[in-house]
Amino acid sequence: MSGPARIQLLSLRLANQIAAGEVVERPASVAKELLENSLDAGARRVDIEVEQGGVKLLRVRDDGCGIAADDLPLALARHATSKIRELEDLERVASLGFRGEALASIGSVARLTLTSRTADAGQAWQVETEGRDMEARVQPAAYPVGTSVEVRDLFFNTPARRKFLRAEKTEFEHLQEVVRRLALARFDVAFHLRHNGRSALALHEAGDETARARRVAAVCGPAFLEQALPIEVERAGLRLWGWVGLPTFSRSQADLQYFYVNGRMVRDKLVAHAVRQAYRDVLFNGRHPTFVLFLEVDPAVVDVNVHPTKHEVRFRDSRMIHDFLYGTLHRVLGEVRPEDRLAAPAAVAPPAPASGAAAGEFRGQEEMPLSATPPAREPARPAAWKGAGAGYQAPSPRPARSAEAGGVYREFFAPLAEPRTEPATRTGEESGISSGDTSLGDTSPGGIPPLGYALAQLKGIYILAENAQGLVLVDMHAAHERITYERLKTAMASEGLRGQPLLVPEGLALSQREADCAEEHAEWFQRLGFELQRLGPETLAIRQTPALLRQAEAGQLVRDVLADLLEYGSSDRIEAHLNELLATMACHGSVRANRRLTLPEMNALLRDMESTERSGQCNHGRPTWTQLGMADLDKLFLRGR
C-alpha cells in the first residue's frame, strides 16, 4: 500500500491553465475580457477581427491610453493590474476589470501577442507568449497610440477543452452577443466587428438621444424600439433608465434582456425576480419580458468581486434595490394609455424593410399594439370630447349618445362596474412619466377618443371601432375582465384585508432562521391578514388567515413566503394568491361571448378601457385590443400599387 501523496506547488503554467478554466470558456470569454480592457483604457473606437469563430484568430484593437513598454511583461503576469491598489479600491471599483489575471489566463491556452503604445512614446512595443513558461521579451513594433491584442489558436495546448467548443457559427454568435452587450453599455464608443473578412457589426459612436435609439434598434431590432417604453427615474441615490418592452412584445425565451449596473452587464436573480413581479399581471404564461435597463448606484453599495467572470453582483441593501426596480417598472407598465400606444414613436432608427402587415400580410399577435393605463388620470367621459363630431362621418354615436351610453353600460354591468377611487397623482420623478395636462381630449386628433367609436359587434366576441388611425378590434370579454379585475383590486386595497381567526391554530415547524424571519416581519404578515405567534425556537402557530384565502393551504403559503423573504427580502406570494382569486371572480363576473351589446354599451366599454390600468391585456396576459391602420388595410388590399 503506497503512502499518502505529497503536497507540492503547481507549476506556473498549470496554475494559469486552471485559472483559465474559470475565465476562458470559449472565444466569447476571451472577447469579453479583451473588450473590457479596451473600455477601461478609455478607448473611443474598438475593432474586433475574428476568424473561424474566434478559435483561429481573435484580434482586438483600440485607441485607448496604451501600456508603457516597461509594463508589458507585467501585463501578462497574474495578479498584476493598474486598476486597483488597496482593499479600499476594490470596495469601490468602477472599472470593468480589476483582477489582473485575464491576459495571463488567455496566454496560457493560446498564442498571444500584445502590442501597445502610449501617447508620449516614440514607438510601439510588443510582447508575445505561447501558452508555456517563457520569459517575456519586449521588442519594438509599429502601431499607433492604443493597444492591440492578438489571440491565435485558442486551446491549442489543451485538446480536451477544444473538444467542447461548438460549431464555428455557434461560437461566433456567442462572441457577437458579447460585443452587442458591451455596445449597449457604452454608447460613447464605436464598435466594428469582422468575421472571416466580412463586416458583421458596425456601430458608430452614439452621442445623442437619436443616435442611442439607433444603436438600441441595431442591437435589439427596430421592433423592440417601436414596442418599448423609455423610462428614467431617480430616487434615494438610485437611477434607473432605459427601455422596457410592452407586455405584448414578449419572447418565448429570455434572450432580449439586458441589465447593467454602473455600466457592467450582470445577470442577477434579484433583478430577475423584481422584473418578473412587475410583469406578473400582464404577461402571458410562458412568455418572457424584454428590456434594456441601466441602474446607476454608488459603487460602494455593490460588490462586483463575487464571480470570476464578474457576471454576478451583490447589493448591500438588496431589498431596497428590489423594491425600487419592482415599483418603478410596475408603475411604468400601468401608466400606458391607448393614446400613448398610438402616438408616433420618438427618436427611432431608420425604418426596416417592410414585413408582416406592412408587406401585405396580417400582423401576428406578437406585434399587436396594446394599452395599459395610468391610475393618475381621470376616467374618460365621452361627452367632454372637444369637437368629437366635427368632420367625423363614421356611423357611430355622437358625443351626446356616448354620454348616454355610460349610464346604460353602468346599469347593464351593475354591480361590478362600481365607481373606482383613483389613486393619488404621482409626480413625474417618482413614476418616470412627465407630469402635465393628461386629459384624453388633448391627445386625440380631431377630438376622437383613442379607441374611437364602436361600429359593430362581430360574432358576439369582438367589437369593431373606428378611430383616427383606422380600425380597432377589441376582445369584449378580455377587456371587461381586466376592467373588473382592476376595480376589485382597488376595492380590496382601499378596504384592507379582513382576517379570519382559526378555531384551531395551525402549528408550523420551521428552521430557527425562518422563525426569526417570521417574527421580524410579523407586522407585515398582520397587514396581509395573517396572525403568526412564535411558540418556540423552531415553531410557529398560525392563528388567523385572510378571509379570501380560507381555502388555501396556509402552512405551505407561509413557508413559501418566508423562503422568498430570506432569498429576496420581499415576497409577493400572498398578493399573487389574492390576485388569482380576484382574477377568477373577474372572469366569471365579466360579459360573456355571444352576449349582444348595443352601440352605447360598446362605446362605454371603450371609454372604460381608456381609463383603466393595464387594459391592454386581460388577467392572463392576452391582448385585449389591436389596431389596423389605414396603411395596413390598404396594403392588405394592394391599394395604391
Swiss-Prot record:
Biased segments, Basic and acidic residues type: 419-429
Chain segments carrying region Disordered: 345-445
Keywords assigned: DNA damage, DNA repair
GO cellular component: mismatch repair complex
Membrane-crossing segments per the record: none
This protein's record includes keyword Plastid: no
A Gene Ontology biological process term: mismatch repair
Family per similarity comment: Belongs to the DNA mismatch repair MutL/HexB family.
Function, as annotated: This protein is involved in the repair of mismatches in DNA. It is required for dam-dependent methyl-directed DNA mismatch repair. May act as a 'molecular matchmaker', a protein that promotes the formation of a stable complex between two or more DNA-binding proteins in an ATP-dependent manner without itself being part of a final effector complex.
Protein's name according to its UniProt entry: DNA mismatch repair protein MutL
Species classification: Bacteria, Pseudomonadati, Pseudomonadota, Gammaproteobacteria, Pseudomonadales
